Amino acid sequence: MKVNEEGFAIDDKEYAMKTELKFASKHSSRLKIERNVMESYSKCDAQCKEHFSELIDFGQSPVWKWIVMTIVGPSLEELKMKYKPSDIPPSTILQCGLQTMKAIHDFHQIGFLHRDIKPANYCIGYGSKSETIYVLDFGLARKYRLPNGQVRPPRPKTKMIGTPRYCSRASHRCEELGRRDDYESWFFMFIDLVDTTLIDWKGLTRPDAYAKKQELFTKLKTYEKHPMFKVISIYLDNLVYDSEVKFGVLREAITDYARGCKLTLKEPLVWFNQSTCPSPSTAPGTGASRMATNIDLKSIASDRNEENSLDRSKTGTLSFNNSKNKKPSRY
């Protein structure tokens, strides 16, 4: 599908487009859920949507439904695969933990649970936004409040939701997920960024992975190597389905740890040490895409997994302020 087949003009900017076949059933349509989430946070003030990509427009053609949004850089999963943990400064990892956690806090503020927190669903910003980490992929999101503002009563039984490596223990038990579960998934993800040896259930069956997660929470309650893990594990383990998670408690655990390690959390995000930094001559595009870290965002992002149906315009993007453009149909 050409990006301008609906009659849009092409300009010199780039956006991202997510598509879905129009005949997808209402129950299987994740794009509509994503659109609802994006419309919800678009109404928030700037501070509360710092970690969300901007919704540019949405519509449908005879075959496709589509959403156009601001473009982002590589995902944390891609960066984890590309660089060794020793290449990433501790300050960057801790700031990554804080930003990804703040994104969850803001997501809950608009009334939704994400339910699929993992490194692949976080991306660093593109170009001038590369100091910001964005949360993406809201296809499994669910409202957790009723119209009167009360937390929805839990359903007696649900199915396992999320990615087995990072999903919460409640998801393994097929229980209704609450705000605590997004944070528990975030915790597994954060641990995996700090100390990859602790997440040792890759490739195991679901029951065995659940048992390993239970063991990890028990272990971390007396874990002295990274004291912040001890604080966070104890706090999260005491929450129940409808608990309101105190973001400040988790943030303070990380900032206290940084202070004890004499780390500043105001340095630029750097995804590898300068000794391994590619020179401009061997990293085309870095000057235009990422000044501080010299990451070639375009080359990494072009390898992104196709399962997310994320398409980039090679020549530009849609322009919505051309009076000659015909208005797309909505969905």
UniProtKB/Swiss-Prot annotation:
One of its GO terms (cellular component) is nucleus. Disulfide bonds: none annotated. One of its GO terms (molecular function) is ATP binding. One of its GO terms (biological process) is signal transduction. It catalyses: L-seryl-[protein] + ATP = O-phospho-L-seryl-[protein] + ADP + H(+); L-threonyl-[protein] + ATP = O-phospho-L-threonyl-[protein] + ADP + H(+). It is an enzyme of class 2 (transferase). Belongs to the protein kinase superfamily. Ser/Thr protein kinase family. This is Putative serine/threonine-protein kinase ZK507.1.
